[in-house]
Amino acid sequence: MPRQIPLEKVRNIGIMAHIDAGKTTTTERILYYTGRVHRLGEVHDGAATMDWMEQEKERGITITSAATTCFWQPRYGLLKDVRHRVNIIDTPGHVDFTVEVERSLRVLDGAVAVFCAVGGVEPQSETVWRQANKYKVPRIGYVNKMDRVGADFFNVVEMIKERLKANPVPIQIPIGQGEMFAGFIDLIRMKGIIYDKEDGTTYQEVEIPHDLENQAKTWRVNMLEAVSDIDDSLLEKYLNGEEITEEEVRRTLRVATLKTEIIPVLCGSSFKNKGVQFMLDAVVEYLPSPIDVGAVTGHSPRDEDEKIARQPDDSAPFAGLAFKITSDPYVGKLTFFRVYSGVLKSGSYVLNSITGKKERIGRLLQMHANHREDLDEVFAGDIAAAVGLKDTKTGDTLCDESKSIVLEKMVFPEPVIQIAIEPKTKADSDKLGMSLAKLAEEDPTFKVSMNEDTNQTLIAGMGELHLEIIVDRLKREFKVDANVGKPQVSYKETIRKKVEAEGKFVRQSGGKGQFGLVNIIVEPSEKDKGFEFVNEIKGGSIPKEYIPAVSQGIQEAMRNGIVAGYPMIDVKVTLFDGKYHEVDSSEMAFKIAGSIGFKEGARKAGAVLLEPIMAVEVITPEEYMGDVMGDLSGRRGHIEGMHQRAGAQVIKAKVPLSAMFGYSTELRSMTQGRANYSMEFHDYSEVPASIANEIVEKSSGKVTA
């Protein structure tokens, strides 16, 4: 079946924001107005379509980014009445699920940033914004919850400018705020939109109310100045006092949004059904199609320096990126992927250029939150799910075997918190390992390991909520009952100096012996670079078939560092010389030699202990400022700044995670429940010597590592 919708009429977008800004409700309304859902789902009664995991329905938060497809014809503007296809990914706002946001932003072309009209720019908004900046994702802003008491559209616009360092340009301003919110003024057409009923499908176009005429003129001038700054010919017209047409405004707004120079800002109340259709018009009008985004670049699987580009074109060779794996009770493993170029047919074979394996596409599915529709083929720009890919992981490239390419991989943060987990019964014991492996396959920030000293299974993740949800899923989806220990900090180790080391493994005791000798340089790598292995063997002092074994031995040794047995990170090892024996050398011998050499090098290189540091933001009434700051300092916190927000004081600090367990209870009692806080992982930093000694002592008899 040929392509149904031309590529320039496709929009791949994400709905992004902090927790409670109304993302899921906004997505629900989009699905309702585009005809994909016949009944409105409300988050607060647990019926939202996009929140389809049991835990999401109970907690009213979105955990996994569900992908869905819908169609929209704008009512106004240059694309009036032209049918567009909109693929939407609903992303979670809770900081423990940042990886889901990161994953979805990687495969999107544009995004709607939803802000709460009362709370404005919250800490998580800043995190998500930084992630979107990293991938240069064009955005429009949507100030939601305009019907709430305390709603202030203009304050939110100011916060977007100040805190996100963006260039917000309102293209609408509200008519009334809070309970008086009735609609908005369209600054491009200079018309008022007043909603009649609660269902939002009925509204009247009116002249601008008298009392808002001056305000509307002021903000229209602001918009015209912003677009004139982008286009010299418009600037000339503007300075000469000539009329700038509606078409020119819309066209320039689109160009500026695509370059991320402007963020068009709209307003509404998704819950009260006001403003969503006009936001959809803006999605189609200002956010990019895959053609606007242009070619995706990657490199040859054989040579990282050989760059390859793939145009968003059905006639180009197939290239796609797997961005999410989920387990489905009916079809098994589902691999969500974005098609960047070419066409993929159901039943065909693709090459996974990361593993080098060919895989067969059993079925292709178009997902609508949690129900699905079978497809015969998918085209450039599509987001779909495949059944049948056994060895594909998140971030892998799928491509045409004859024209292979490796797209940029996704980098995921290291887990910061871990707990010991043990099955309650023998039956649970049999299922636990398999169930955890499935969950780890779905979520790259969830890690499972074994403490060899105590024989305990350890699970690690991005926060307490993250691990709570995992344990909950074990019980519900996999029917595994487990006991969990207290949360433990995931410490890491690294080195501070550059040293040379030798690793020698010799075993000669009759018959075939074992021999391997390696000379390596061990040094710190750049922060967040992970492990780097450089092979500089010249002249065959170690045969090339043994080199991967050396790297493997080093990586295995890094799993248990030498300070307190914690994993080592940010280390670079260069293999520059060695010796082998014609008869006695083997892969195993060189693997052990690599491990011995690395351990010796790490000892000489001044190995140190690292701990996760959290960026903490506390919002408190002024009278508790002193107590809160004193308490944070007592937790080894470093206060970085304070400012006012909506009548409260905001304190920003960097605090070790180990000092933050149980903080919410302490904060409640200190402020009589009037303060709240949020925190997210910032980085790993060296543990002070006195505390490091305590940790080492504990770990020498440790129960959980």
From Swiss-Prot:
Pfam families: EFG_C (PF00679), EFG_III (PF14492), EFG_IV (PF03764), GTP_EFTU (PF00009), GTP_EFTU_D2 (PF03144)
Amino acids binding GTP: 17-24, 90-94, 144-147
Example of a GO cellular component annotation carried by this entry: cytoplasm
GO biological process, one term: ribosome disassembly
Limits of the tr-type G domain: 8-291
Example of a GO MF term: GTP binding
Transmembrane feature ranges: none
Cellular localization per UniProt: Cytoplasm
This protein's UniProt keywords: Cytoplasm, Elongation factor, GTP-binding, Nucleotide-binding, Protein biosynthesis
Tagged with keyword Lyase: no
Role of this protein: Catalyzes the GTP-dependent ribosomal translocation step during translation elongation. During this step, the ribosome changes from the pre-translocational (PRE) to the post-translocational (POST) state as the newly formed A-site-bound peptidyl-tRNA and P-site-bound deacylated tRNA move to the P and E sites, respectively. Catalyzes the coordinated movement of the two tRNA molecules, the mRNA and conformational changes in the ribosome.
Family the entry assigns: Belongs to the TRAFAC class translation factor GTPase superfamily. Classic translation factor GTPase family. EF-G/EF-2 subfamily.
Protein name from the UniProt record: Elongation factor G
Classification of source organism: Bacteria, Pseudomonadati, Chlorobiota, Chlorobiia, Chlorobiales
